[in-house]
């Protein structure tokens, strides 16, 4: 058995198939980890979601901001944006099956045996892994509860609060947790977010640092796999932290990492036009 991890697919199915064929991936024997953002902006969002769902017993995925956006649009909370490529999913006969599976996925995955954490955007420096898992579970519970789901989806949009406070309650609390796990790039040592800057390491606003670079980050010593930040092009220069989003949907490449051997495989992508997010 081999375990592989790959970055944001965003509806780019053919590069994933290329990589899985290259390593002779066999569902049922091997496992595939995904950093989230399975859909949107790419040309095959429906086909990608169906493909992943079809081998769901061999897949571990976390949710990204585009996956959550899909759920919000599907529940008539949010409208489709011009750059969205989600309409085929919304009109598909199996949409309910696919979307119900999607909302049961995690925000944060920890493989204790391997000592590896999987997340879409990152873990803020002021949270320990134990605390991060506990807070992720709060959002996961809201997503899986039919009575709470619409309120959560309606409240998750927005940047405030930009800083975590344990006294936060209700919608603001869940929004803050969601933004850390699915939208974060730069923050201060106390976790204050900058949610506007989307470029590389050199574009940090004054006083802000990439979330993984803070010297006192409480998850130091943990191996963390993350996506979301295509502008890093797979390079974050931080021991134990691995950036897997190499900008497939923007014409970069899709990267597949063998977690057992450390070997990387890449497949070039045609890409789609738009703004990173």
Swiss-Prot record:
Do you know which Pfam families this protein is assigned to?
A: Metallophos
Q: Single GO molecular-function term?
A: bis(5'-nucleosyl)-tetraphosphatase (symmetrical) activity
Which CDD domains does this entry report, sorted A to Z?
A: MPP_ApaH
EC number, UniProt record? 3.6.1.41
Disulfide bond positions? none
Give the InterPro entries listed for this entry.
ApaH (IPR004617), Calcineurin-like_PHP_ApaH (IPR004843), Metallo-depent_PP-like (IPR029052)
Signal peptide residue numbers = none
Q: Does the keyword 4Fe-4S apply?
A: no
Tell me where on the tree of life, at the top rank, the source sits: Bacteria
Keyword Hydrolase applies = yes
Q: What UniProt keywords are attached to this protein's entry?
A: Hydrolase
From the UniProt record, list the reaction(s) this protein catalyses.
P(1),P(4)-bis(5'-adenosyl) tetraphosphate + H2O = 2 ADP + 2 H(+)
Q: Which PANTHER family match?
A: CYTOCHROME C5 (PTHR40942:SF4), PTHR40942
According to its UniProt entry, the function of this protein is described as:
Hydrolyzes diadenosine 5',5'''-P1,P4-tetraphosphate to yield ADP.
Q: Which family does it belong to?
A: Belongs to the Ap4A hydrolase family.
Would you tell me the protein name for this molecule? Bis(5'-nucleosyl)-tetraphosphatase, symmetrical
Q: Which organism is it from?
A: Azotobacter vinelandii (strain DJ / ATCC BAA-1303)
């Amino acid at each position: 058995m081999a375990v592989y991890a790959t970055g944001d697919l965003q509806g780019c199915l053919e590069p994933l198939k290329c990589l899985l064929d290259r390593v002779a991936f066999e569902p049922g024997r091997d496992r595939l980890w995904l950093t989230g953002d399975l859909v949107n902006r790419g040309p095959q969002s429906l086909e990608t979601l169906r493909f992943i769902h079809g081998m769901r017993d061999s897949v571990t995925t976390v949710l990204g901001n585009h996956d959550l956006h899909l759920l919000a649009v599907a529940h008539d909370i949010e409208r489709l944006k011009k750059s969205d490529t989600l309409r085929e999913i919304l009109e598909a006969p199996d949409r309910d099956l696919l979307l119900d599976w999607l909302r049961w996925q995690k925000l944060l995955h920890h493989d204790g045996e391997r000592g590896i954490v999987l997340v879409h955007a990152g873990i803020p420096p002021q949270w320990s892994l134990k605390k991060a898992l506990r807070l992720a579970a709060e959002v996961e519970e809201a997503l899986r509860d039919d009575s709470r789901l619409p309120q959560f989806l309606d409240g998750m949009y927005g940047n405030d609060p930009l800083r975590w406070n344990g006294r936060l309650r209700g919608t603001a609390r869940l929004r803050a947790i969601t933004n850390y796990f699915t939208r974060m790039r730069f923050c201060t040592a106390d976790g204050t977010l900058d949610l506007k800057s989307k470029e590389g390491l050199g574009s940090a606003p004054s006083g802000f640092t990439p979330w993984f670079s803070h010297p006192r980050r409480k998850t130091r010593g943990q191996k963390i796999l993350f996506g979301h930040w295509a502008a890093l092009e797979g390079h974050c220069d931080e021991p134990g932290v691995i950036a897997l989003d190499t900008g497939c949907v923007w014409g970069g490449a899709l990267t597949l990492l063998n977690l057992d051997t450390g070997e990387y495989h890449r497949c070039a992508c045609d890409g789609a036009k738009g703004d990173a997010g």
